[in-house]
Amino acid sequence: MTISREIDPAAKADIEKFERMLELYLNGELEEDRFRIFRLNNGIYGQRQGGHNQMVRVKIPYGRLQPEQLEMLAYIAETYSRGWAHITTRQNIQLHFVQLENIPQVMRDLNSVGLTTREACGDTVRNITGCHLAGACPYEVLDISPWAEATFRHLLRNPYSQRLPRKFKINFSGCATDCGQAMFNDVGVIAVMRPREDGTVEPGFRVFFAGGLGANPHAAQALEEFTPREQLLPTIEAALRTFDHYGNRDNKLRARMKWLLDTMGVDELRERILKERKLLLAATTWAEGIPETVQQAGDGPAGVSTAVDPTPVGVPVTLRLSETNPYARWEAVNVIRGVAKGTVSAYAHARLGDVTAAQFRGLAEIQRELGLE
């Protein structure tokens, strides 16, 4: 498959380094544990079937894919995997049974369409997830898509993202429905509004920290009532730096950020994050203002509190199914309309989370037909 886009220089350097490390490993010049850590930080899991079978995890920031990316996933699935891929609950795409010697070429193919496996695994900042209706939800305060993209770009290859005490997960939601599930992530961001003195409202965010499930589950805690848009990225990085400074590096079972709530307490952990943010904002190296990614794309909502037809998010379906045709029944429970932008979202269900190469290509074709490139 031929793609004209040039590979990003940083990504090219990553791939060349992976090739060098792989050669050393295959020649017996690099010990297993060292290569395993390096491999994981590049999004490559070794499978347990023996041999050189690998699982490749591709980050899909906030779950959004372009047609050429879907087509490339189809090509890789057919050429290097088993003809299909798997969607994860954190908006990654996983390809199984890829042979270790093919990994560098798979990375090149992915990077040629703007995708990466970098930091998809290991003790890193994992994929930045977001509400699946971002930009189309009729109740969103902000379109979180450009904010998730800006966060992804800021933290990818960031020095603080490389060797954390444990993995670090961030998500975004555009409204209080919280489709991004902020309450059980290391950092959860929900778009909110606060009143101005002139009677208008200011859009911004409410940031939550140190949530998690599994052993020792904790609901995330609010950092402050309102975080201005200009301070979102430094707030997220401050939480990351605090975790890097104080997280448990001796026991991986107690290394996630939620454990700091037990060792420090909510108030002290909150205070340290806010102190770290203050230091960041005072640094001459910090770029002030709204991130360029957000300025270029805009973050206007699809339609705040707009009446929609047929069924808005979170409202039970009241349609009498016996009185309508099959299409109307499907539309009533599967279609969301964002009035302000004229957007329409329709759900498609992937059985067991698996998507075939033909289905990837079919989605790409639909996107092109609708002008969604």
Predicted stretch roles:
Residues 1-373:
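Peripheral terminal and linker regions in Fe-S/redox and tRNA-modifying enzymes
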